Amino acid sequence: MKLVRYGRAGAERPGLVDATGRLRDLSRVVEDITPEVLTPAGLKRLRAVKADRLPAVKGKPRLGCPLAAIGKIVCIGLNYTDHAQEVSLPLPKEPTIFIKANSAISGPDDPIARPPGAVKLDYEVELALSLIHI
């Protein structure tokens, strides 16, 4: 099951991509793709839904940030040897931990604005773990 959020930025709707690759509207089932929807109970509820009975989404709408209601984003930098070598930096002896604003998350094809004064942007990020406190 591939969960997505689609639509205009700031007004995304919940959806899923079915086994045939077709985008389906999930808004009759859940209000949005939130951390609560990703709990075992929430995922069990979604697995019970028959995707072919959900409305098909027409066209190719924008895909947004995959998760709504994102809290704090804690990151670890330079934790892969290959990436450190790509950016010509040594691996740190201790993990480099930093926090990102949740506004840094975007859809896969959204433009990325370079902050004023920024000289370089790093393109690589891996999602390792999402901690949910309900």
Tell me what each language-model feature is.
Residues 56-58, 109-112:
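Short gly/ser/thr-rich secondary-structure transition/capping motifs
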Residues 78-81, 101-103, 117:
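Beta-hairpin (beta-strand-turn-beta-strand) motif
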Residues 91-108, 121-123:
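Structural signature of FAD isoalloxazine-binding scaffolds in flavoprotein oxidoreductases
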Residues 15, 128-129:
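Active-site and channel-lining beta-strand-loop segments
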Residues 1, 10-12, 107, 116, ...:
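Short beta-strand-initiation
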Residues 132-134:
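Conserved small/polar residues in nucleotide/adenosyl-binding loops
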Residues 63-65, 85-88, 112-121, 126-127:
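A generic local secondary-structure boundary/capping motif
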Residues 1-95:
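N-terminal non-catalytic cap/leader segment that marks the start of a structured domain
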